[in-house]
Amino acid sequence: MRPSFASWGLLALLLLQGPLLQAQPLSPALQQLLSLSSQRLQLADQVAQSKAQSGKAVQDSPREEQQLQMLAGQAGSHGVGAEQVRLLFAAQIEANKLVQYRLLSRPLPDAGQAVDLERIRSRLNQLNLELLRGYAPALAELRVDDCRPRLNQALQRQVRVDRLDELHAIALSRAAGDLCHWAEL
């Protein structure tokens, strides 16, 4: 069977667009921010296990607000606005809860010994500080005309690098989905 003119035309169109679709330059600060966000999301599995063991609720509004206020208070020393920081970390928290709720909606395997939530929170605090440090450089990379394609490419790359499953890939997208908007604030 010979290819039709239409199939050759489609192939040519894809080949011509391919380089344009791949032309987004690598954004190292953005990629680092997404890597940190991904690491933060992967801790949600342990948090969910801890909450399953303890019976604690996923929603912890007082702690969330405390964290948001503390991080927003550090915004100026990291070259970003307090509102930008609140938006970033509110999205991080929501993405983390998305993972927790999904994992808790099905029986979790027995972890054996109790999960140390304080150790996990300590790691989350460390990642939060690293996210805060990397936020201004990432926003600077996103203040371009092609922000959305650049962000999408970086998200796809992070999903591949970290071999994220569908749940964590969706959560990462949720955690970073509004970065282009936040860069303009």
Swiss-Prot record:
Pfam families the record matches: CM_2
Q: Which keywords are on file for this protein?
A: Amino-acid biosynthesis, Aromatic amino acid biosynthesis, Isomerase, Periplasm, Phenylalanine biosynthesis, Signal
Q: Catalyses which reaction?
A: chorismate = prephenate
Q: Which SMART domains match?
A: CM_2
Major localisation: periplasm
PROSITE patterns linked:
CHORISMATE_MUT_2
Signal peptide (residue range): 1-23
Name the Enzyme Commission number(s) assigned to this protein. Answer: 5.4.99.5
Q: Which domain of life is it from?
A: Bacteria
Per UniProt, substrate binds at 40, 51, 60, 64, 100
Example of a GO biological process term: L-phenylalanine biosynthetic process
Tell me where it resides: Periplasm
Identify the Gene3D superfamilies for this entry.
Chorismate mutase
Please give the pathway this protein is involved in: Metabolic intermediate biosynthesis; prephenate biosynthesis; prephenate from chorismate: step 1/1
| EC supergroup of this enzyme | isomerase
One GO molecular function term of this record is: chorismate mutase activity
Amino-acid biosynthesis among keywords: yes
According to the entry, every stretch annotated as the Chorismate mutase domain falls at 24-104
The terms describing its cellular component in GO are: periplasmic space
**Classification via SUPFAM superfamilies:** Chorismate mutase II
NCBIfam families in the cross-refs: CM_mono2 (TIGR01806), PRK09269.1 (NF006741)
Q: What role does it play?
A: Catalyzes the Claisen rearrangement of chorismate to prephenate. The joint presence of this enzyme together with cyclohexadienyl dehydratase and aromatic aminotransferase in the periplasmic compartment comprises a complete three-step chorismate to phenylalanine pathway and accounts for the so called hidden overflow pathway to phenylalanine in P.aeruginosa, in which two possible routes for it exists, namely either via phenylpyruvate or L-arogenate.
Q: How does it assemble?
A: Homodimer.
**What is this protein identified as?**
Monofunctional chorismate mutase
Species source reads Pseudomonas aeruginosa (strain ATCC 15692 / DSM 22644 / CIP 104116 / JCM 14847 / LMG 12228 / 1C / PRS 101 / PAO1)
